[in-house]
């Protein structure tokens, strides 16, 4: 991702060779030094990691911090598949199925996926009423905030805490619930208006028909007012 940012997008702030290896006296960087380089841009994520149980485990085992999961030179775009207990998950490389870490990874992954599904369902509900011409600005704002909660929860994965990630996911779920309620109310308003329009059209039709028949009667020869 850093190479794409630098070479394709032209982002000169993206890390390059010199950031880890130096300029003139280039050498092999210490593992801890690379983590410090990452923290210059990913400061919040790094701070969450430093306060997590993984920090002490990495230090005691001599495992690199950021590189252990994200690599060094070939840093790929992150995805939710990296989390959890699936075949592509990184957690299972160290945590056995009976371990606490395995269960925590499973729970965090499920909470993230649940929020994603809830957001998708809310988008579909809001989209349907929006296509009917209803005002859904507030519902869309709720969905945007829920997406922000999802992004924040993904960052807080680095706490490796089911409770901390779960609390953020709950914030997102609350916003999604509000969006769904707004969409439901908009749908009910649309149905009420539609019934009102139908009733009004029916009244106009009856009035017009009555008036037409009255005129026809009056126009017949020999009929008086």
Which residues fall in each region the model found?
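Inter-heme linker and motif-flanking segments adjacent to c-type heme-binding CXXCH motifs
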Residues: 1-117, 121-124, 128-138, 152-163, ...
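Juxtamembrane interface at the cytosolic side of transmembrane helices
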Residues: 205-225
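Alpha-helix boundary/capping detector
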Residues: 117-120, 172, 198, 205, ...
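Long, amphipathic, charge-rich alpha-helical segments that form helical bundles/coiled-coils
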Residues: 139-154, 196
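Juxtamembrane/start-of-transmembrane alpha-helix segments at the extracytoplasmic/lumenal side
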Residues: 184-203
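Long hydrophobic alpha-helices with heptad-repeat/coiled-coil character
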Residues: 33, 146, 222-225
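Amphipathic alpha-helical bundle/coiled-coil segments
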Residues: 94, 143-150, 166-180
């Amino acid at each position: 991702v850093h190479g794409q940012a630098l070479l394709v997008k032209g982002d000169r702030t993206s890390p390059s060779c010199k950031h880890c290896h130096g300029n003139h006296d280039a050498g092999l960087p210490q593992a801890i030094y690379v983590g410090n380089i990452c923290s210059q841009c990913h400061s919040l994520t790094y701070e969450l990691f430093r306060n997590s149980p993984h920090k002490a485990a990495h230090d005691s085992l001599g495992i690199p911090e950021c590189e252990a999961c994200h690599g060094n030179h070939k840093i790929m775009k992150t995805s939710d598949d990296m989390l959890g207990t699936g075949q592509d998950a990184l957690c299972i490389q160290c945590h056995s199925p009976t371990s606490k870490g395995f269960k925590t990874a499973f729970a965090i992954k499920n909470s993230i996926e649940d929020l994603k599904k809830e957001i998708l369902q809310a988008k579909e509900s809001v989209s349907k009423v929006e296509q009917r011409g209803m005002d859904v600005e507030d519902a869309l704002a709720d969905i945007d905030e829920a997406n922000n909660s999802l992004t924040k929860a993904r960052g807080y994965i680095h706490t490796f805490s089911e409770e901390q990630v779960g609390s953020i996911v709950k914030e997102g779920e609350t916003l999604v619930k509000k969006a769904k309620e707004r969409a439901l109310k908009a749908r009910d308003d649309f149905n009420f208006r539609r019934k009102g329009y139908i009733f009004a059209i029916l009244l106009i039709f009856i009035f017009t028909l009555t008036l037409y028949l009255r005129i026809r009667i009056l126009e017949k020869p020999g009929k008086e007012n």
